[in-house]
């Protein structure tokens, strides 16, 4: 504690606060969308918010202090996006069973130290194609929502473009402020839905179904490892932190496993928001930036305790605002995934197949588009990567050589 107080700085605290606010401004919206399409009860949604907030806060504080590195733990936004399409077709108990299975798999990967080996075997373009396909509907949803409330959505879109040009780090936060301001000014806010209350965890007994495990657990594992831990570790490495990956993965997976029966779909390393805390904006001295990780964890805890209030706040806003905010918050992720999917010429076609299958929303044999996207993509990668046999070329006839008469 003495070392923490000695290294304390206002800039690091502000960095942690901004990282937390941006986490709630964007990815949390997707969870509300998933809960809405699945018609989850208010107390279950409140418990879901409580688990991901408390889990992120506790792990962020402990890991930041332990390794003296600004570590931000967050819930998986792509994983939440996957649940938007899957939750309406399964029971909540089956979903929790899939959460447990995915957490166990990620935990085993972390404990075994096999993270690097697994990532090296899975083509990055295939993983990126699946991620882009999962997120695709949120990008299109942004523009579909223009029909419902054109002035609100277009104002948010314009704000996003302006801030992306001038202050890209605060673009999503600015979009949220503009959207909320317009909603309140136009009288669209449902003030009767606002309540003040503390969140309480709700136990959900798990049920296990092989179809649900393949549909949800397998894609969640892939998304966590390739879409969260890989870029999360890249952010740390980029700013000079050589923290080992295995304990970070194992700790996140263990936290996810313990909180899964209360609705937690998965905790992992943050990437975009983590960059706010690992850079110079947090502190000039890299060894003191871990305070930003602790700060972010504390803010997560505070907001998690008042999860019921957060749920009611988001429920009071129009659906168009939520859809537009989710789409804008994920634009960079969609663009990055598409760029990575098309980056390697030899894998481009396989990645495109993965993207198209996943984005199609198809279902076959009870298995989801995300699962089939990986299967079709990997199959295409293997088949297209086979070396074509070199056809035998006949030797050209000798020129100017006379035939020898037969004897």
Range-by-range predicted roles:
Residues 1-46, 173-245, 393-407:
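Helix-loop-helix hairpins and the membrane-proximal interhelical loops
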Residues 2-6, 12-31, 50-131, 243-331:
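Helix-loop-helix junctions within the multi-pass membrane cores of secondary transporters/permeases
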Residues 10-13, 155, 214-215, 250-254, ...:
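Alpha-helical membrane-protein architecture signal
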Residues 21, 25, 38, 62, ...:
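Structural signal for hydrophobic packing residues in well-ordered secondary-structure cores
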Residues 25-26, 151, 227, 269, ...:
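Residue-level signal for transmembrane alpha-helical positions in Major Facilitator Superfamily
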Residues 82-83, 159, 235, 277, ...:
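Buried hydrophobic packing segments
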Residues 88-194, 295-394:
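Membrane-embedded alpha-helical modules
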Residues 141, 253-261, 402-407:
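Cytosolic juxtamembrane regulatory segments of multi-pass membrane proteins
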């Amino acid at each position: 504690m003495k070392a923490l107080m000695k290294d304390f700085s206002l800039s690091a605290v502000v960095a942690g606060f901004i990282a937390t606010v941006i986490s709630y401004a964007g990815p949390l919206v997707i969870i509300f969308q998933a809960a809405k399409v699945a018609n989850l009860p208010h107390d279950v949604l409140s418990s879901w918010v409580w688990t991901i907030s408390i889990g992120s806060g506790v792990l962020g504080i402990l890991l930041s202090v332990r390794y003296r590195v600004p570590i931000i733990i967050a819930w998986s936004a792509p994983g939440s996006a996957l649940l938007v399409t899957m939750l309406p077709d399964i029971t909540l108990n089956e979903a929790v069973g899939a959460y447990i299975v995915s957490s166990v798999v990620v935990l085993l990967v972390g404990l075994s130290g096999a993270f690097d080996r697994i990532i090296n075997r899975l083509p990055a373009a295939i993983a990126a194609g699946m991620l882009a396909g999962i997120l695709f509907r949120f990008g299109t949803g942004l523009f579909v929502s223009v029909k419902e409330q054109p002035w609100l959505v277009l104002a948010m879109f314009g704000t996003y473009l302006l801030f992306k040009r001038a202050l890209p780090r605060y673009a999503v936060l600015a979009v949220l402020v503009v959207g909320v301001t317009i909603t309140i000014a136009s009288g669209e806010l449902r003030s009767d839905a606002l309540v003040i209350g503390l969140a309480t965890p709700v136990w959900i007994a798990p049920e296990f179904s092989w179809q649900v495990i393949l549909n949800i657990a397998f894609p969640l594992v892939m998304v966590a490892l390739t879409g969260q831990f890989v870029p999360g570790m890249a952010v740390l490495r980029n700013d000079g932190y050589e923290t080992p990956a295995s304990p970070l993965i194992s700790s996140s997976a263990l936290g996810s496993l313990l909180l899964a029966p209360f609705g937690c779909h998965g905790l992992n390393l943050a990437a975009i928001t983590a960059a706010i805390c690992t850079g110079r904006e947090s502190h000039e001295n890299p060894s003191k930036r871990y305070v930003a990780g602790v700060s972010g964890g504390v803010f997560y805890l505070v907001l998690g305790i008042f999860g019921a209030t957060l749920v009611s706040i988001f429920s009071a806003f129009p659906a168009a605002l939520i859809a537009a905010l989710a789409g804008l918050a994920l634009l960079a992720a969609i663009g990055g995934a598409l760029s990575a999917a098309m980056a390697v010429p030899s894998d481009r076609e396989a990645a495109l197949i993965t993207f198209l299958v996943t984005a199609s929303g198809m279902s076959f044999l009870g298995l989801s588009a995300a699962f089939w996207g990986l299967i079709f993509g990997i199959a295409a990668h293997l088949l297209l990567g086979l070396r074509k046999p070199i056809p035998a070329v006949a030797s050209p006839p000798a020129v100017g050589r006379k035939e020898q008469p037969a004897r």
